[in-house]
Every structure is written in C-alpha cells, then in structure tokens.
C-alpha cells in the first residue's frame, strides 16, 4: 500500500502537534520536597501494653499523625523526631513498637532522623537503631545533622546520665562538655545557616546553651520538645537589642497537651515552622480536654514561628 504525499504530510503535522503539546505540559512535580521537613516530638509509645494498660491511646494517636504526614503533597524529604520516643523508661519493647510504626514513613522514601528525650535510654535505643552509634557526630551521645537546601539542622542529645532502672528517671536535661565543645566548633566553622534542635529547652536545667547560641552568627534559632505544648519565645543575653534569638516548642503526637506536629519549610532568606494541631487533652487521653479542646485547637492551629536566615 502506497502512502500519498498528502497523507504523509498530514501525519507529520499531527505528530508535531503532539510533541508541541507535550513540550508545553508542566513537568511532573517531585514526590518529595527537599525544602520541607516534619518535626514530631514526645511520642511516648508503650510497647508493654500489659504493664501499662491505661496508656494505649498514644499508639493510635501516633498512627493518626503518620497518616496526616503521609497525606501531605508533596511529601517531606525529612521527618525529624525530637525525643521521648519511649513511654516512660526507655524499654526495648517501646522501641520495637516505634520501629514498626515508623516503617510507613521509610517505605514512602522519607528520611527519618531520631533524637532522644529524658524518657529514652541510649543503650536500648542503640539496640534497635545501631547505626546511630557509628553516625553520631559526638561519641557517647546521639547527635545528627540534617542537611536542607538553605539551612542545616543539628539534633543534639540533652538526656542526662539517669540510670536505666525504673523509678530513677529524671526530667532535667544537660549538655556534656564534649558535646558543647563540638557544637561551638561546628557553629564557628558553619558555611550556611543552622537551626539547633534538642528535646530540652536550650536554657533549661544544665543544658546551658544560651550564650553559645546567642553569640553564634550561624545559628538562627532553636526548636525543642519536652513541654507537650506549642509556644514561641526568644532567648536574650542581658538587654542586648542587636539579636532576637527565636525558639519554638513542639506539641506531642499523642501523650497529653497540644497534639499534632509541625512542618518546617525553608526559603533562601527564612525558614517557617507551622503548627498542625488537631487535638488537645490531658493525661486521661483523647476526650479529656473538654470543654477547652475546640477553643485551644482553633486558636493555635496554623500558628507559625519564623527564623530569619539572612
């Protein structure tokens, strides 16, 4: 069968139209946004259900948080945990449960970085996640760096030397001499802005980071957990008006207090932390926060804290 010259030219014209249409189509959006991270804190997951049967709701609440994170479009490139993964004593069973509940995030290609809180124990944590013993930036502590396009996150380890045994817990935080010296050298050598992170507030107990962070040109702010409620504040040394150092506290994913997580989005000149709060309750679990729950969630959800990077 012979093709006429007219048919041949018509085919070329149609093909050119298809190619032109494809050229004008927007490129597919990446599944993960490298400028977006999610911050979670104070999970308090209970792997010993028979021993603490009244605290099973933390697992359900954390699964709800994971579902909301997985519904973000695009997905965050990073999820950063600010500690208190364990319910109370850093039991191995708590970390086994946590690893199971983290898996959907990992399966979705999200990088997970874990920090420790006062209810965690390094030895049992490292049994479940042994890679942190090699990757830590400060031997003997669990210290990590998360690199984002416009800022680096430094996750510090502020848990103290509390014994592993039950009923010998301690809420205060501390920063070891070695970690403090490492942080001072790292901030001095930094070539891009830094946000420091920890479970405890930087000026709380023996953490003692106020002067170091306030005096650093690279450090632009600090984010922490522990208090189970969202708030924004600032650090200052004396009454020096030259630098306001913003800090922000994260909610719990489901133990008590403000319930939710925060998204952290970076831009060339700033980074914005945004609260995603969808519940509030006390230690009785979901439903224990009435009649204040609706008012608190409505007032707080969507609040932001801005860190200026330049």
Predicted segments, located by residue:
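Solvent-exposed loop/turn segments at secondary-structure junctions
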Residues: 43-46, 85-88, 118-122, 159-162, ...
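Short acidic, glycine-rich surface-loop motifs adjacent to enzyme active sites
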Residues: 185-202
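Extended active-site neighborhood of metal-dependent phosphoesterases/phosphodiesterases
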Residues: 29, 91-182, 208-221, 232-250, ...
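N-terminal secretory signal peptides and thylakoid transit peptides that target proteins
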Residues: 1-16
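Active-site neighborhood of phospho(di)ester-bond hydrolases with catalytic His/Asp-centered motifs
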Residues: 40-41, 79-83, 111-117, 195-199, ...
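Acidic, His/Gly-rich catalytic cores of divalent-metal-dependent hydrolytic chemistry
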Residues: 270-310
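N-terminal active-site segment of His-dependent metallophosphoesterases
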Residues: 25-93, 185
């Amino acid at each position: 069968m012979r093709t006429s010259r007219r048919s041949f030219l018509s085919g070329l014209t149609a093909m050119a139209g298809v190619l032109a249409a494809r050229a004008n189509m927007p490129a597919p959006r990446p599944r993960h946004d490298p400028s977006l991270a999610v911050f979670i804190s104070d999970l308090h997951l209970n792997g010993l259900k028979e021993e603490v049967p009244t605290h099973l709701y933390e697992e359900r609440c954390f699964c709800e948080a994971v579902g909301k994170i997985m519904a973000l479009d695009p997905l965050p490139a990073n999820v950063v945990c600010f500690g208190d993964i364990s319910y109370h004593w850093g039991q191995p069973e708590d970390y086994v449960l946590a690893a199971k509940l983290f898996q959907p995030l990992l399966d979705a290609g999200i990088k997970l970085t874990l920090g420790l809180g006062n209810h965690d124990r390094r030895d049992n944590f490292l049994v479940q996640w042994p890679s942190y013993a090699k990757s830590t930036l400060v031997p003997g502590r669990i210290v990590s760096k998360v690199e984002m396009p416009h800022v680096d996150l430094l996750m510090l380890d502020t848990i103290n030397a509390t014994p592993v045994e039950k009923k010998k817990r301690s809420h205060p935080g501390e920063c070891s001499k070695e970690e403090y010296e490492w942080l001072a050298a790292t901030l001095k050598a930094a070539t891009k802005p830094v946000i420091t992170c920890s479970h405890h507030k930087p000026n709380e107990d023996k953490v003692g980071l106020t002067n170091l962070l306030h005096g650093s040109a690279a450090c632009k702010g600090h984010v922490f957990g522990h208090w189970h409620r969202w708030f924004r504040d600032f650090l200052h040394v004396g009454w020096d008006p030259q630098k306001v150092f913003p800090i922000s506290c994260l909610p719990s994913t489901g133990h008590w207090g403000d319930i939710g997580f925060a998204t952290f989005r970076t831009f060339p000149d700033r980074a914005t932390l945004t609260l995603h709060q969808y519940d509030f309750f006390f230690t009785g679990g979901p439903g224990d926060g009435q009649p204040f729950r609706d008012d608190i969630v409505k007032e707080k959800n969507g609040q932001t804290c801005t860190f200026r990077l330049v």
